Swiss-Prot record:
Belongs to the DEFL family. Disulfide bonds join C31-C76, C40-C59, C45-C70, C49-C72. Residues 1-27 form the signal peptide. The gene is LCR36. This is Defensin-like protein 155. InterPro entries: DEFL. GO terms for cellular component: extracellular region. It comes from Arabidopsis thaliana (Mouse-ear cress). It comes from the Eukaryota. Keywords: Antimicrobial, Disulfide bond, Fungicide, Plant defense, Secreted, Signal. GO terms for biological process: defense response to fungus; killing of cells of another organism.
C-alpha cells in the first residue's frame, strides 16, 4: 500500500512541475534586437538597451574574429 501511494505522489508532483514550467514559458515573451554600437562597450550597451527598450544589453560575437555587437533582450 505504501509503494502505491508513494508512486501516486511522485506522479502527481511530476505532473504539477510540468504544468508550472509550461505556464511560466507562456508568460515570458522575450524579444531581441541588435543595437548598432561599434565597437561594443558593455557599459554603453547596457545603458543604451535600458533607455531604448527597458531591457538587458550585452556584447556578443556572432562569428569568430568579428567585432562584438550589442544584443538587447527585452519584454515584447
Amino acid at each position: 500500500m505504501a509503494k502505491i501511494s508513494c508512486s501516486y505522489l511522485l506522479i502527481l508532483m511530476l505532473a504539477l512541475s510540468v504544468f508550472s514550467v509550461v505556464e511560466k514559458a507562456k508568460g515570458d515573451k522575450r524579444c531581441s534586437i541588435i543595437i548598432d554600437l561599434s565597437p561594443c562597450y558593455p557599459i554603453e550597451c547596457r545603458l543604451s538597451c535600458i533607455t531604448e527598450r527597458n531591457g538587458d544589453g550585452e556584447c556578443v560575437v556572432s562569428k569568430v574574429g568579428s567585432t562584438p555587437n550589442c544584443l538587447c533582450t527585452y519584454d515584447c
